[in-house]
Structure formats: structure tokens, C-alpha cells
């Protein structure tokens, strides 16, 4: 009875809006009916928020997650200043339903691991919900898991990113922008692959991704693939699944040659360089502890700029002689001008 009521309620909304409706399948496999022309969206996932900005759909965002600055970095406000005035309506795992309804969004984007009760609360008031995972895997346990076990990580994230960008672009009526974003991402990625193809696995640089509180990424996340594509051997991949805390003794035993730290955790650089216990590690001894630029998003989920220019930056740090003829800064500026419509102003 409730299901029939909701379907009828949605039909009434579409009828009063005077719009035709389209049916989409989100990345959890859910069928979702959405207005033909979408001008008002709410976003409770930072990855989708970043994609909407690059698709030139920022003006359609009427509600946003409360901690988007923390998730995307303090400098992100420069890329999308309009977001500062957008009302907060929840976060990755919760929603302020009253605030959301007042904004009258035509669709709400959530993460694939958003609680089912959260999705139900939104859909029960007649607002369509689209879940985005940016990974595509046939195994059922991967769909709504924050630490998925993927049958084929490479294919899952490549196909998942393409599918996610295409889905979001189609929903917000930016299909051509989505196609161009996908093309640029994978065209740029091929440049790195060609230059690193002859490096044997046992000669790849040992690298470690350092996060606060001795957390790191092992296998099953895009972070590990990013390191792999850039020619690194992720020291945590063999024993760590997903995102987990490790001991300093474990890191010392791995003895990475290079340590990378995401731009949103700048304090970790000083912690590592100033702590006497870390000084026995090759990366620290040889001053190869790098704070990553904002575009090199070593997240659990893939982002197009991370694949296109982030992996290039990382590869150039690991193997500078192989990329000496490439102007990484110029490639970065070109990306920012094309997809963020501004100059890059961060560090390299």
C-alpha cells in the first residue's frame, strides 16, 4: 500500500511540475524516476559534488553536505565559491529531512554506503535518490560496502568511474560535458602507462600512503591503484584490505622509499619528519616525504583529476627522469582551466 502511495505521490509531483520523467538505474542497481530537465539537486557525497563542479553544474546545487570543506579540502571553496551559500542538509550517513524538503530538490545524490533508512526517509517524501559508488563489480558484497572486496579492482574502478560520470551527467542534462571529462581522463592516463610499462614489478619504488593516526590504504581502494598506475609498489597492499590503522613498527618493517600524504592532512608531514622514531625509514632519511597537491586525490574512490593529472604528478615524483620532458604544471593548469574554469593556484 505504501509503495502504491509513493508512486502516486511522485506522479503527482511530475504532473504539477509539467515535466516528463526519465528512468535511471543508479550504482546500487536501483531504478529511479527523475524529471526530464533537472535544475535543483542536493548532494550528500563529496565525490559527486566534485564531479558536478567539473561538469559545470554547480548552479544546480541547492543543498549540500555540511562538511564538504573538510572532505574536499579548504581550498575547494576557490573552485566553487557558490557552495558557501548553499544550505547544509546532512552528510554521508544522515539527512536533515525538513531542511531538504524545503529546498525542493528534484534529486538527491548519496554515497553507495548511505544507510538504507536514510534513503527510505528521502524517497518516502517523494524525492528521488541516486546512489553513486564509482565502482562497478559483479560481486554483491561490493555494492554498498565502504571497503569493498572487488574481483577486479582495475576494471571495477575504470568502469565504475565512467558509469558514474555518465549517470550524473545524464541526470543533470550535461551529457556532452560528461563524455569530454571521461575522454580527457583516460587519454591523459595513457601517457603515464606508456612510460612505465617496462619497469619490472620487483624494481618499482616502495611507497606508503600516510594518513592521520597511522591509518593507510591497502588493496580494494582506488588509492592503491593510483600508486600502482604511477609505478609504485604499495607496501600495505599485500596485508591490508581497504582503509585501516597500522602500527609504526609495521611501517618501519615495510621501510618505504617514498611516503605520500594527501593535501587535506598537511600536519602529518611535520609529524613524520619531526618524530625521531620515523627517521630510520628510507623515505624520511632521503627527504622523500611528499604532501600531495589537491588534484592528486588519493581517495578510496577515483576522481577524474586524480587519474589524469594526479597519477602523472605521482609518477614524476617517483621517476623524475622518465618525465623530465613533460611540463606537469602546464598539464595541471590546462585541466583546471577546462574543467574548473579557473587557474590552478595550489602547490606542486
Kindly label every feature range from the protein language model.
Residues 89-92, 96-113, 127, 247-264:
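Proline-aspartate-enriched helix->loop->beta-strand connector
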Residues 31, 118, 123-211, 293-348:
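Extracytoplasmic substrate-binding proteins
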Residues 69, 222-243, 247:
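Alpha-helical, coiled-coil/dimerization segments enriched in small aliphatic residues
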Residues 5-14:
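Sec-dependent N-terminal signal peptides
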Residues 42-44, 62-65, 107-111, 129-133, ...:
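Structural recognition of the beta-strand scaffold that forms the well-ordered cores
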Residues 43, 49-102, 107, 131-132, ...:
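A short, structured surface patch at a secondary-structure boundary
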Residues 15-19:
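N-terminal signal peptide c-region/cleavage motif recognized by signal peptidases
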Residues 27-29, 86-98, 135, 240-248:
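Short helix-initiation/N-cap motifs at beta->coil->alpha
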Amino acid at each position: 500500500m505504501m509503495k502504491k502511495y509513493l508512486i502516486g505521490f511522485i506522479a503527482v509531483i511530475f504532473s504539477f511540475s509539467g515535466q516528463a520523467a526519465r528512468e535511471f538505474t543508479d550504482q546500487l542497481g536501483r531504478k529511479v524516476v527523475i524529471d526530464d530537465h533537472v535544475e535543483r539537486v542536493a548532494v550528500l557525497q563529496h565525490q559527486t559534488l566534485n564531479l558536478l563542479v567539473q561538469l559545470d553544474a554547480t548552479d544546480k546545487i541547492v543543498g549540500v553536505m555540511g562538511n564538504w570543506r573538510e572532505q574536499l579540502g579548504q581550498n575547494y571553496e576557490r573552485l566553487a565559491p557558490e557552495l558557501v551559500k548553499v544550505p547544509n542538509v546532512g552528510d554521508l550517513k544522515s539527512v536533515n529531512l525538513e531542511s531538504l524538503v524545503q529546498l525542493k530538490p528534484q534529486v538527491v545524490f548519496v554515497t553507495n554506503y548511505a544507510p538504507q533508512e536514510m534513503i527510505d526517509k528521502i524517497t518516502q517524501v517523494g524525492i528521488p535518490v541516486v546512489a553513486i559508488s564509482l565502482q562497478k563489480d559483479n560481486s554483491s558484497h561490493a555494492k554498498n560496502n565502504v571497503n569493498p572486496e572487488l574481483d577486479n579492482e582495475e576494471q571495477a574502478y575504470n568502469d565504475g568511474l565512467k558509469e558514474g560520470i555518465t549517470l550524473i551527467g545524464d541526470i543533470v542534462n550535461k551529457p556532452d560535458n560528461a563524455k569530454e571529462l571521461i575522454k580527457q581522463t583516460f587519454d591523459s592516463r595513457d601517457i603515464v602507462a606508456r612510460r612505465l610499462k617496462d619497469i619490472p614489478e620487483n624494481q618499482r619504488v616502495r611507497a606508503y600512503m600516510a594518513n592521520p593516526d597511522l591509518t593507510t590504504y591497502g588493496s580494494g581502494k582506488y588509492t592503491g591503484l593510483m600508486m600502482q598506475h604511477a609505478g609504485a609498489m604499495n607496501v600495505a597492499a599485500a596485508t591490508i584490505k581497504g582503509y585501516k590503522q597500522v602500527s609504526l613498527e609495521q611501517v618501519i618493517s615495510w621501510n618505504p622509499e617514498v611516503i605520500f600524504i594527501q593535501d587535506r592532512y598537511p600536519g602529518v608531514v611535520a609529524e613524520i619528519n619531526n618524530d625521531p622514531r620515523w627517521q630510520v625509514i628510507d623515505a624520511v632519511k632521503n627527504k622523500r616525504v611528499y604532501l600531495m597537491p589537491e588534484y592528486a586525490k588519493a581517495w578510496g574512490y577515483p576522481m577524474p583529476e586524480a587519474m589524469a593529472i594526479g597519477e602523472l604528478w605521482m609518477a614524476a615524483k617517483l621517476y623524475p627522469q622518465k618525465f623530465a620532458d613533460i611540463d606537469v604544471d602546464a598539464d595541471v593548469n590546462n585541466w583546471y582551466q577546462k574543467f574548473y574554469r579557473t587557474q590552478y593556484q595550489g602547490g606542486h
